[in-house]
């Protein structure tokens, strides 16, 4: 059975006019390696820590500024939200299609809330806590191309023509602000687009981005702004002591106009100084150590890296299944080809390397979890190939071959072929990222013994379900297994309304 909404009644939760207060007993374990009777052994000690959560239930008017607004993702998301807001339908060769938010975790997935008369009861994910309605989001942003969003939508060739015609009047007046352009960080083939750029030194560019965000907030009368990078993949920045390894060195490098400070890092700096959440949707190392240091100092939310949309999402499910089943993946070969501007930019070796790193690290934690299958330092052969084929446009092809060792020296090979509209997968993920980033800024918590409430750590691991290479605070383990990431996100939101984690034991029927 599916219900649209619910309210929790419990001694552990209290609803007030503007807040939800909850108490949650976090059950975990502590491990110690100690000598007992002359022999060292591992001791596992269960422990319980009481947490209090406080969630602001006032849903703000939200503005979203996209870096690369005029690209395939930006124009597709903007058009999709308008179509949903206006209730637009359009003819395809198969049927009359209604606008929807399929592919969005927050808008189109469900959570189990319990059982009733022997039947499982589910509710929308978005019913857990008050969230911004995507129909109410105000979009803006920057792009190195001055093409308006209606023409950009046509250039992208993602949405059906009948839908594009209906959206054009809403999008013709939407023109991106000038963006930061540095040809050293992206493929040379992007130069022909760059007719809408911010001039000046890196310090002046940061100041302009700050001004743009303030103007956008004032002109659109929004309460909060979230910024997300959906522009070209950049090459990796060199991390150098004295250049970008600390907040102080990073800001000094901006003052000196150092060439190695990337455009994406400049946007992130501007956002941190304005306390505006910044999310990196591409694989480059935008968050150099100095930027992470700066965000922690100023307690400003950052999240990333790289949208987890198709092939990598499948990989994080399949490898988790194989290793969890005691099967040993020994070779993973992933091949992609696509024909959109993302593929064109990735045809340059230096930008492809960023994507290769992002895609290749996704199985590391799963491999490390099983010392029966893998010796220390052992890892599957893992190859990623991306090719640019203009004809296929936004319809990305992904082919994977997984070779594994099974019982008694046997071999198993799984081959997958996935064809998908790249931007139609990415757009709802962008939506989820900005909505969850905004929501997380309204949640505060404190552990037993802490004097006052505080926000989540500014490095937003809560967003990891949606990213290929989750950004985590220094010293924090990286989790890539998809089911664990979703459970983490759902269970944190459940704790905010006093609900226990979904552990799937269902003891009442055992």
Curated annotation (Swiss-Prot):
Is the keyword Isomerase assigned to this protein? Answer: yes
**What GO biological process terms are annotated to this protein in UniProt?**
inositol biosynthetic process; phospholipid biosynthetic process
- An example Pfam family from this entry, by short name, is NAD_binding_5
Species annotation: Sesamum indicum
The free-text function statement in the UniProt record for this protein reads:
Key enzyme in myo-inositol biosynthesis pathway that catalyzes the conversion of glucose 6-phosphate to 1-myo-inositol 1-phosphate in a NAD-dependent manner.
Q: Which residues bind NAD(+)?
A: 70-73, 143, 180, 190, 193, 230-233, 281-282, 306, 309, 340-342, 355, 393-394, 422-423
**What are the disulfide bonds?**
none
Q: Which reaction does it catalyse?
A: D-glucose 6-phosphate = 1D-myo-inositol 3-phosphate
Question: Mind telling me which InterPro entries this protein's record contains?
Answer: Myo-inos-1-P_Synthase, Myo-inos-1-P_Synthase_GAPDH, NAD(P)-bd_dom_sf
What's the protein here called?
Inositol-3-phosphate synthase
Alphabetized SUPFAM superfamilies for the sequence: Glyceraldehyde-3-phosphate dehydrogenase-like, C-terminal domain (SSF55347), NAD(P)-binding Rossmann-fold domains (SSF51735)
User: Taking the first listed entry, what is the main subcellular location of this protein, grouped into a coarse class?
Assistant: cytoplasm
- Identify the pathway: Polyol metabolism; myo-inositol biosynthesis; myo-inositol from D-glucose 6-phosphate: step 1/2
Q: What is its EC number?
A: 5.5.1.4
Q: Cofactor(s) for this protein?
A: NAD(+)
Q: Which family does it belong to?
A: Belongs to the myo-inositol 1-phosphate synthase family.
Q: Which residues form the signal peptide?
A: none
Q: Which GO terms describe its molecular function?
A: inositol-3-phosphate synthase activity
Instruction: Report the locations given in the UniProt record.
Output: Cytoplasm, Cytosol; Nucleus
UniProt keyword list:
Cytoplasm, Inositol biosynthesis, Isomerase, Lipid biosynthesis, Lipid metabolism, NAD, Nucleus, Phospholipid biosynthesis, Phospholipid metabolism
Keyword Nucleus assigned: yes
Superkingdom is Eukaryota
According to the UniProt record, one GO cellular component term is:
cytosol
């Amino acid at each position: 059975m599916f219900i649209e909404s619910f309210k929790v009644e419990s001694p552990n939760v209290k609803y007030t006019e503007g807040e939800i207060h909850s108490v949650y007993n976090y059950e975990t374990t502590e491990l110690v390696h100690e000598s007992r009777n002359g022999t060292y052994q591992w001791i596992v000690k269960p422990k319980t820590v009481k947490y209090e959560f406080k969630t602001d239930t006032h849903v703000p008017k939200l503005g979203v500024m996209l870096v690369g607004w005029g690209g395939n993702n930006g124009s597709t998301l903007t058009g999709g939200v308008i179509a949903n807001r206006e209730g637009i339908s359009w003819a395809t060769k198969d049927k009359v299609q209604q606008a929807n938010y399929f592919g969005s975790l927050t808008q189109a997935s469900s959570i189990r809330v319990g059982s009733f008369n022997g039947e499982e009861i589910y509710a929308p994910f978005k019913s857990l806590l008050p969230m911004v309605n995507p129909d109410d989001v105000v979009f803006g942003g920057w792009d190195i191309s001055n093409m308006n969003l209606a023409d950009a939508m046509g250039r992208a060739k993602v949405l059906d023509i009948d839908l594009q015609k209906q959206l054009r009047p809403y999008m013709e007046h939407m023109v991106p602000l000038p963006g930061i352009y540095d040809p050293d960080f992206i493929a040379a083939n992007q130069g022909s687009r760059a007719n809408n750029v911010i001039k000046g030194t890196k310090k002046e560019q940061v100041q302009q981005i700050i001004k743009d965000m303030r103007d956008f907030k004032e002109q659109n009368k929004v309460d909060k702004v979230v910024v997300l990078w959906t522009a070209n993949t950049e090459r990796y920045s060199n991390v150098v002591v004295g250049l970008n390894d600390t907040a102080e060195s990073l800001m000094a490098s901006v003052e000196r106009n150092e060439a190695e400070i990337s455009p994406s890092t400049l946007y992130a700096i501007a956002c941190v100084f304005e306390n505006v959440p910044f999310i990196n949707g591409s694989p480059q190392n935008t968050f150099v150590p100095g930027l992470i240091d700066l965000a922690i100092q100023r307690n400003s939310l950052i999240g990333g890296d790289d949208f987890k949309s198709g092939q990598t999402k499948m990989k994080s499910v399949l490898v988790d299944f194989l290793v969890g089943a005691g099967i040993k993946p020994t070779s993973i070969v992933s091949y992609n080809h696509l024909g959109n501007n993302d593929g064109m930019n990735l045809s340059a070796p230096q930008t492809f390397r960023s994507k290769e790193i992002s895609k290749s690290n996704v199985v590391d934690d799963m491999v490390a979890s099983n010392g029966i299958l893998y010796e220390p330092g052992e890892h599957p052969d893992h190859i990623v190939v991306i090719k640019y084929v203009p004809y296929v446009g936004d319809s990305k092809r992904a082919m994977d071959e997984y070779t594994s060792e099974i019982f008694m020296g046997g071999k198993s090979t799984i081959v997958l072929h996935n064809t998908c509209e790249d931007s139609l997968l990415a757009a709802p993920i962008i939506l989820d990222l900005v909505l969850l980033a905004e929501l997380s800024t309204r949640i505060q918590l404190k552990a037993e013994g802490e004097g006052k409430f505080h926000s989540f750590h500014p490095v937003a691991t809560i967003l990891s379900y949606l990213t290929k290479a989750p950004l985590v605070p220094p010293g924090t383990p990286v989790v890539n297994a998809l089911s664990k990431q979703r459970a983490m996100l759902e269970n944190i939101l459940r704790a905010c309304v006093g609900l226990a984690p979904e552990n799937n034991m269902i003891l009442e029927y055992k």
